[in-house]
A protein has these predicted regions:
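A short Gly-Trp-Pro
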Residues: 1-9, 14-123
C-alpha cells in the first residue's frame, strides 16, 4: 500500500495529528514496552510526514534502554499515538489504531525483533 494522508488522535482527542504513511506492512514489536502496550505500528516514515495539529503540550515522552527512541503518550488518556524509532531516529511510526478509518484488527502484522536491540537491560 502506498503512503497516504490520515487524520488521527488519541482516545480523549487532546492530541490530534495528520500523518502521511502506508498502513501495510503493519508491525508489532516484541520489546518490553511494545509487548505491554500492544500497539500495531505503521511502516516507518520521515519526521516531516507527521504534523501535530492540536495538543502538542499534552504529549509526554518516555525513553528507556539506550534512550534513543522517543515514545509519545497523551498525558490525559495514556494512549500512545506515535514514536521516533531507535533503529533510525530520523524515522517515526504511528499507532495504526489511532488513525481515522483504519481497522487495526483487519490487518496482518509481522513481528519486529525489538527485544534483540537491548544493550542495557532486558527488553
Amino acid at each position: 500500500m502506498s503512503a497516504t494522508w490520515f487524520k488521527g488522535s488519541c482516545h480523549c482527542g487532546a492530541v490530534k495529528f495528520e500523518v502521511r504513511t502506508a498502513v501495510t506492512p503493519a508491525t508489532r514489536c516484541n520489546c518490553s514496552l511494545c509487548r505491554r502496550r500492544g500497539a500495531l505500528m505503521s511502516p516507518m516514515f520521515a519526521a516531516s510526514e507527521l504534523k501535530i495539529v492540536e495538543g502538542e503540550g499534552a504529549l509526554t515522552c518516555y525513553q528507556f534502554n539506550t534512550r534513543t527512541a522517543r515514545h509519545y503518550f497523551c498525558s490525559h488518556c495514556g494512549i500512545y499515538p506515535f514514536h521516533q524509532t531507535r533503529m533510525n531516529p530520523a524515522c517515526w511510526r504511528v499507532n495504526l489504531g489511532c488513525l481515522d478509518g483504519v481497522d487495526p484488527y483487519a490487518l496482518d502484522a509481522t513481528v519486529a525483533n525489538g527485544a534483540s536491540l537491548s544493550v542495557v537491560e532486558d527488553a
